[in-house]
């Protein structure tokens, strides 16, 4: 009967969900990021930027601007491009790395490439006229495309590279943020945009002896 068929379907669905839940549980780690080795001591070199010359310095910047964007990957760049489209050209971009790219700045190891079709993944293709050379672009091509976006939309003058956020405090009486950085910058802004990613730091397995 139809009623019995519905029962069988419900049982099959419950069984499938139980299997998926069991597999998910196998892959969950209660120790979170504690499962990884700390990037210190013999592993300290993994916490440095291999793509820049050591010893970079610059004078601290003290300024007021409309917006501060944290992150120079696609999220940060697209935010900046959209601000320019809206007529806002008074903003700063703060990026830990030495160039635009985010994930694709840090991850350039041999064979690294995107697992999403390039024509879907890469933004602003119509605006830049860029045509990916492969269905799944290599990390190198994506990084170079990020640089192209930076040049095409004139984002480089807005960027503070090799710089990290130290603090961001909202002052209600002044109606602004005070953003301080690892370079001693003090930047006041009305809008503070967090556009950072999660794939910029090495995660080494916490296996004894390695």
Residue ranges and their predicted role:
Residues 1-8:
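Short, small-residue-biased leader/transition segments that mark boundaries at the very start
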Residues 9-60:
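Non-catalytic terminal and boundary segments that flank Rossmann-like NAD(P)-dependent oxidoreductase
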Residues 19, 29, 105-145:
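Glycine-rich active-site loop/strand segments that organize a redox cofactor
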Residues 40-57, 64, 122-132, 138-142, ...:
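Glycine-rich dinucleotide-binding loop and its adjacent helix/turn
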Residues 63-93:
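N-terminal Rossmann-like FAD-binding beta1-loop-alpha1 element of flavoenzymes
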Residues 84-109:
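Glycine-rich FAD pyrophosphate-binding loop
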Residues 103-105, 190-191, 202-208:
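Short, solvent-exposed loop/turn and secondary-structure capping segments
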Residues 132-200:
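Feature captures the FAD/FMN-dependent oxidoreductase FAD-binding
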């Amino acid at each position: 009967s139809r009623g019995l068929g519905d029962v069988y379907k419900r049982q099959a669905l419950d069984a499938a969900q139980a299997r998926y839940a069991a597999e998910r549980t196998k892959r969950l780690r209660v120790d979170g990021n504690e499962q990884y080795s700390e990037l210190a001591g013999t592993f300290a070199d993994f916490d440095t930027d291999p793509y820049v010359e050591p010893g970079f310095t610059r004078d601290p910047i003290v300024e007021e601007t409309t917006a501060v964007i944290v992150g120079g990957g696609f999220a940060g760049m697209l935010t900046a491009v959209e601000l320019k489209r809206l007529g806002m050209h008074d903003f700063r971009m703060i990026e830990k790395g030495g160039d635009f790219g985010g994930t694709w700045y840090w991850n350039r190891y041999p064979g690294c490439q995107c697992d999403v079709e390039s024509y879907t993944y890469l933004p602003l293709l119509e605006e830049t006229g860029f045509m990916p050379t492969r269905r799944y672009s290599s990390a190198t091509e994506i990084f170079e495309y990020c640089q192209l976006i930076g040049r095409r939309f004139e984002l480089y003058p807005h960027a503070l590279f090799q710089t990290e956020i130290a603090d961001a405090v909202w002052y209600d009486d002044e109606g602004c943020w005070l953003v301080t950085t690892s370079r001693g910058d003090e930047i006041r802004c009305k809008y503070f945009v967090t556009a950072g990613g999660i794939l910029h730091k090495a995660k080494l397995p916490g296996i004894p002896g390695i």
